Amino acid sequence: MLKPSDLDPKSLRLQATRRARNALERDFIAREVEQRMAERLDLIRHVPTIIADIGCGRAAGQPALSARYAQATYLGFDLSAAALRHAQHASAPASMLARAGRWLSQAGGVLTGLRGAAPVAGGAPIFVAADTHKLPLRNSSVDLIWSNLAWHGFVDPLAVVAEWHRVVRPEGLLMFSAFGVDSLRDLLGPQAELVSFPDMHDIGDALVHAGFAEPVMDAERMNLGYRRAEDLIAELRAALGGNALTGRRRSLLGRAVYRRWIDALESRRSADGLIPVVLEIIQGHAWCPSRKRLPEGLSPVTFTPRAVRSGTAPILPPRE
């Protein structure tokens, strides 16, 4: 069963900002999983007009999504405004970047404004610094929710799933990926106090409970090998971040501790000269029913008048 995590939101935001500086240099894991997600889109008939990318970071996947769905408006949401500035710079002309800079620096007002209006289909990508637990979108305003390897940074996964259901339109699609429970299980070292990863069955149950239909969940192992322990650490930090637990040790990791970590990884080097790492990658998608459940668990009820026979009128009970 999914439960709220012990993650510190402030620490998550600071780590995301630090990773934004060099995320693209160590982005192999996210890009590989993203490509696998895109292959699944080839099998799904869906034509969105509004796409919400949750936890987009520097939005390296935005060009591919926008190319696939040229008619759609792309909305990228992330905790880090710094990451989104990189995304805006990479995807828009300088004139749009200047406007976006002022926009992001006044995030509070913009987010309040977005709650009152749905985005317009088509046009340039839009990037918004926002809490993924409270998206600045009105109800039933998005056709496709896309989230690539962002799950481990959700403080309250159940609240995020409920928010996804709130903003998705009837017959809209949710597609996401996440690190699974078996990720890094065999990785030893002083940083073993990593955030616990979800079980795919628990995610499926949460989707159904929130109101999504026909969830399809799959898990596969990604076997990686690194020649240098330092590269392994750098790539995992780019994909996962550091220790953001509320009860984490606040002091810096000393050189001696870091050296012991490197030595522990080196001791795991296999016969082919590589240090192995195993990640469990969960991929899932689900649909929002055409008759979408309302907030507070309510469901819409439609009353259809009984067919009127030819030449007769419906019989109504007499008024008292």
Segments from the language model and where they lie:
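Conserved catalytic/acceptor-binding region of the Class I
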Residues: 171-231, 238-255
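Conserved Class I S-adenosyl-L-methionine
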Residues: 220-320
